[in-house]
Amino acid sequence: AAHVDNAPYADKVVGYFLCGGSGEWNDYWDYSQPAQQGFAEWLSGKYGNNIQLLKEKWKSKDITFETIRLPSWNELCVADDGIFYTPERSQRIIDFLYYHHQVAADTVIDFAKAIKEETGNRKLVGLWNGYIFLPGWWNGSAPYNIMTNWRTKMFSKVLESPYIDFIAAPYSYQERHSGGFFVPQIPMDSIIFHGK
């Protein structure tokens, strides 16, 4: 932002559109040691450092905060019921998705805050986010549960951020053909309600 603010075209720039990964904040799963450690720390906070409660919720007698492992790609590909995970069978997956999506939301909010601070709050900041309506995407033919890879499970956090001014999303990819129709993927009323 500082570089652009000092450029001859600075007065032509009204804002910044944050893009991560493909531009839509989708990524490949992070199986690094810091990701493993971050997940364990997040779980410790969520469950109040109570390993017995975690064992009960995950239905795992042998787990400790030190031996927690991230769900494999194959585990993330298969939901319990269509695109849904149930706490009774998949609390471990649910916890991981909440953690992973929270990290993504925190990241975009941190970037947005940095831009706002760097520009003296004079520039707009937006991003792709909020894809909660994906009609036709889960029809059994997808190679994985597509809902797990949309960094929008923490959409409320993004909506409530004072550093993000607008949110955008392409219309559904499923009906992009001759004779197709426009299907929005984001909850427009919620976005408007939050002043975005």
Predicted regions and their residues:
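Short amphipathic alpha-helices and their capping/turn segments at secondary-structure boundaries
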Residues: H3-P8, Q185-F193
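Polysaccharide-binding and catalytic clefts of secreted carbohydrate-active enzymes
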Residues: A1-I164, P170-Y173, F181
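Extended catalytic core of nucleotide-activated donor transferases of GT-like folds
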Residues: E175-P187
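Aromatic- and carboxylate-lined catalytic core of secreted/periplasmic carbohydrate-active enzymes
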Residues: K196
